[in-house]
Amino acid sequence: MYTGADVKVEGERLSNKKEKAIREAMEALARPLPNKRILGIPFKLMMYNLAGDSVKERSIGGWIRRKFGEPPVLLSSVSIDRNNAVLQSDLQNQGYFQAEVAGDTIVKGKKARAEYTIKPGDQYTINHVDFGSDSSALQTAIDQCAGKTLLKNDDPIDLGVIKAERERIDAYLKENGFYY
């Protein structure tokens, strides 16, 4: 039975706060999620198992299994390679372009967990924001809205902020008659 993912962040120049933020974000991305627990007990899994294997769909046991049960999450449903790719992609979206992710499974008895080791490297930052220079009406409109930019010098590169800036400029241009 799969009990979840553990993420270890290895970085020389990371603050504890940043290391914790990376670890929590990566643990949230790892799939599949283990069976839910209430006070440390996998209650839904217990209900699923108590209903039995050969329960008819229309019986009370079948209803309990469907309504309150949750099938076990097995190690065979865990794709280490896919999770490695997802974690790597998210780190790159946060500006860690040279991050390394390695995953492995650890089996102890009937329980198994995935363990991911992340070496994020240096986080790239925005050195300078330049919207180009041109004498067209479009460039003039972009220059007018450039003062409210979401991209600031020395901020870490974040794909979400870059997309938000692109959408902000797009909305501004559409409000000013640029629809092409």
Predicted regions and their residues:
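Interaction-mediating elements
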Residues: 1-180
